[in-house]
Every structure is written in C-alpha cells, then in structure tokens.
Amino acid sequence: MSVEIKTIEQQEKMRIAGKLASEVLDMIGEHVKPGVSTMELDEICNEYIVNTQKTIPANVGYRGFPGTTCTSINHVVCHGIPSEKRLKNGDIVNIDVTVIKDGFHGDTSRMFIAGKTSNQAKKLIDVTYESMCEGIRAVKPGNKLGDIGHAIQKYAEGNYFSVVKEYCGHGIGEIYHDEPQILHYGLPDTGMELSQGMTFTIEPMVNLGGAGVRLLSDGWTVVTKDHSLSAQWEHTILVTSDGFEVLTLAPNESI
C-alpha cells in the first residue's frame, strides 16, 4: 500500500481546504431547526461554497451522488441524500461536507440538533464526539492505525454504544478517498505505522443500539438495522513531527 506523504506546500494547501470546509459547517448551524428540509440546507451550503468561498463542492456528482452535503437524520448512519424531508423537533442530523480548493480536499462533519432532543440522543452525540477525539489523540509518528481504532472503540463501547465497522475514514489530499483506510475499531500496535506528513480523516459512526447497518435501495443511504439512533463526527488530520494537527477544527474547539 502506497500512502502519500504531503510536502510542506501540500500541507499548507490542506490547511486552507480544511478551514474552508469547517467554515461551511460554522455557517449552516443557525439554519438547522425544525421545519427546514435537508434539501434547503444543502442548497444553502452549495450557495456558500460556490458563490462566497469560490471553491468546489466535492460531493456533487461524486460517483453519482446528487447533493453537496450528506445529511443523515436520526437512524441514518451516513451518506443520507438531501431531500424535501423536513426536520422535526428533536431530530439529530449529521451534515458532512467536502470542499476542493486549489486541487486539495477538506472533509469534515458535525452533529446538529433541531430544536431540543432527548438526553439519550445528547449522550450519543457527546460520546461519539469524544470517541473521535480519543482516536485523534492516538495520532503521532510511530503509533499505528490500530491504535486509532482501538481508542475509538474502547471509548464508545465503554459507554455501552456500538461502533459501525462497515465504513471508515480515509487518506485525503488531491484524491478524495485515498489510502490508508482508517478503521474505527481494532487492536493497539497493529496495522500501518503513522508517519509525519500523512493526512487522513477520522470519522466514527456510533449507534445507540446494535452495530448492524443496511444500505437502502438508493445505493447511498445507510441506516441502522434496529432503527436505533446513530451519530457521526469527522475531522481531517495531519500527522506532525510530534503528534497531530486538526485541519478542520471549529472555532473555540480544542482536542
């Protein structure tokens, strides 16, 4: 397996793309509320990316995907297609966006709540976020991919939730989905060794119920088999000389 090590110049372009992707989610947050459709949210994101940022929405037409964002509500695990479906009070939704700037991709997703939701849903969102952070904190040269997956799995399952195993993070740069695959489960000290200059996403999907998922007939939407809630967070990460840099960090976010 060949994994690209980014040059200093490439790393700087990744920082710019990552910041732009993060800014899309900063912008869309105030629009997530009961009554809005995911199609409307998608159109707002597209308008912002194309006309304000002057960047390229990577998802549009990617392998036939019809939207700018993936919008995954409640029991939808990932890759939800924007539609006329309107959010209801208490819905939780993941918005996943990728932009291309100067040929480089920035990829990130966050959880949002429409109105007020249950304590159980809030805990799922929080535990999923912290599991991502645990995985990110395992990133440094000399550590291995299995250390990332193990940290995520240990935290999520330690809180009695389950980790989706069918979908994973990925290398990223000029190629959207590149090597290596970043599994969100695994054993410590296994897999590829991390090296300075690698860039990849960490994006765990965590379910309130069982880990089982199924793909709907549209070929994109993935849902929990038991119809339980699912949450996901995602950041793009750079391996630095002594640890990591989060390229898609939100304002006031610290990992």
Residue ranges and their predicted role:
Residues 1-255:
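Active-site neighborhoods and metal-handling regions in enzymes and metal-associated proteins
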